[in-house]
């Protein structure tokens, strides 16, 4: 999900946020 930046999926450490 790092490519999509989905913080709502419990992935706040993605590229977008």
Curated annotation (Swiss-Prot):
Keywords: Oxidoreductase, Peroxidase, Stress response. It catalyses: 2 glutathione + H2O2 = glutathione disulfide + 2 H2O. PROSITE patterns: GLUTATHIONE_PEROXID_2, GLUTATHIONE_PEROXID_3. Gene3D superfamilies: Glutaredoxin (3.40.30.10). Induction: By water stress. InterPro entries: Glutathione_peroxidase, GPX_CS. One of its GO terms (molecular function) is glutathione peroxidase activity. Coiled coil: none annotated. Its EC number is 1.11.1.9. GO terms for biological process: response to oxidative stress. Belongs to the glutathione peroxidase family. On the 2D-gel the determined pI of this protein is: 5.6 to 6.7, its MW is: 20 to 23 kDa. This is Glutathione peroxidase homolog.
